[in-house]
């Protein structure tokens, strides 16, 4: 599994548009100060995700995600999760939880988001939900994000081609 958090803001992300030269096209926007905190892990073998919407991403919300992952994988003896070096993944509370857990964390080298497949997943999520979409109310925005995860099965064919573990080893 690959794990990371994302923090999309309640504001449209304009990815492309065709506007005739000399014309203006107003784009609706919000304050952009409200955002969601989404912590998640994706299993690229089964194309399934465990997702949490939390007020903040910290050690407590990370442990809650671990518990959710363990409940979703009752038959697994060990669960390896690949993640970045976020402070909350290395916290004392998380380390203590992992001592009696079936989860093993495998930390990626610093500054290597290209090795964490969930980064591609988050980009796909944002492309589907945020790009060129305007949500007047924050609740509409939050519901659209939640709908994406509820309907994740409909995206599996595209995700299978996007979330491949084709890494090339270079150097020694």
Regions found by a protein language model. Give the residues of each.
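RNase H-like two-metal-ion nuclease catalytic core shared by retroviral integrases
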Residues: 83-85, 92, 106-128, 138-141
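Short, conserved catalytic/metal-binding motifs centered on acidic residues
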Residues: 2-8, 40, 47, 81-85, ...
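C-terminal anion-handling pockets and recognition modules
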Residues: 119-172
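Short, basic/hydrophobic alpha-helical segments
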Residues: 61-79
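Extended, low-complexity cationic-aromatic segments
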Residues: 1-67, 166-172
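RNase H-like polynucleotidyl transferase catalytic core
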Residues: 25-31, 101-117, 134
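Structural signal for conserved beta-strand scaffold positions within catalytic alpha/beta enzyme cores
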Residues: 2, 51, 107-109, 131
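Catalytic-core regions built around general acid/base machinery
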Residues: 93-102
């Amino acid at each position: 599994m690959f794990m990371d958090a994302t923090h999309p803001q309640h504001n449209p992300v304009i990815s492309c548009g065709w506007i005739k030269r000399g014309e203006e096209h107003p784009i609706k926007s919000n304050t952009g100060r409200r955002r969601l905190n989404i912590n998640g892990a994706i299993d690229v073998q089964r194309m399934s995700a465990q997702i949490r919407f939390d007020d903040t991403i910290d050690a407590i919300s990370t442990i809650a995600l671990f518990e959710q992952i363990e409940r979703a994988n009752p038959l697994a003896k060990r669960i390896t999760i690949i993640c970045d070096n976020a402070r909350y993944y290395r916290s004392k509370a998380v380390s203590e939880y992992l001592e009696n857990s079936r989860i093993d964390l495998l930390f990626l080298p610093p500054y290597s988001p290209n090795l964490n497949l969930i980064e591609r997943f988050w980009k796909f999520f944002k492309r589907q939900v945020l790009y060129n979409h305007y949500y007047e109310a924050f609740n509409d925005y939050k519901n659209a994000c939640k709908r994406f995860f509820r309907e994740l099965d409909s995206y599996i064919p595209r995700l299978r081609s996007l979330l491949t573990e084709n890494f090339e080893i270079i150097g020694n």
